[in-house]
Amino acid sequence: MKIDLNADLGEGCASDAELLTLVSSANIACGFHAGDAQTMQACVREAIKNGVAIGAHPSFPDRENFGRSAMQLPPETVYAQTLYQIGALATIARAQGGVMRHVKPHGMLYNQAAKEAQLADAIARAVYACDPALVLVGLAGSELIRAGKQYGLTTREEVFADRGYQADGSLVPRSQPGALIENEEQALAQTLEMVQHGRVKSITGEWATVTAQTVCLHGDGEHALAFARRLRSTFAEKEIVVAA
């Protein structure tokens, strides 16, 4: 069994360098919610050094609230903003001898695209326009995954180790109780259940079916690195190979 481990980088966390030794894919902030040209260059350089797949992490234009503000923008605006961000990272990667492999939207852009078909289409269209060989990463079973497949893109369905799920397989909004799993044992058990058995227990007790092709590790939690190391160790014990 194989699984991809991804982390969002270039967002101002001190753990970026260590996370790059533990994950197989890096989603690099492109300046709209965090990061800038220099952090993009630095993250790309470290990803190449560690043999980690390089990906763009585009966002709504929302540095004030870290890309977590809901926005209702015209699809053509989202298309242009997404193309702008992923094009910038692709060029930075190429200039350093690397290749951008995937795109994963950030924050509220990710969450809204999981449910809003027009928004999902705009993102998928931008990814396809940049490079049809790019992998589009989105929430398992989401509108974004469906849109990517409609454009003929390779898609990668994502699950979260430390997020609570609703009965329909969507994430519990961060504003609601149960959104974040802070207990390490619970997060580890949830991750193994999703990866090995394709299901997750919702906060209301029902089982939801999920396809787990990549697991997101957040690097900004207090015990993020310790959990990442433990997850890697557990995967090794279960003979689950970590690779992009």
Swiss-Prot record:
Record-linked Gene3D superfamilies: Glycoside hydrolase/deacetylase
Presence of keyword Nucleotide-binding: yes
Top-level taxonomic group: Bacteria
Cysteines joined through disulfide linkages: none
N-terminal signal peptide: none
Catalytic activity: 5-oxo-L-proline + ATP + 2 H2O = L-glutamate + ADP + phosphate + H(+)
Protein name per its UniProtKB record: 5-oxoprolinase subunit A
Organism: Escherichia coli O139:H28 (strain E24377A / ETEC)
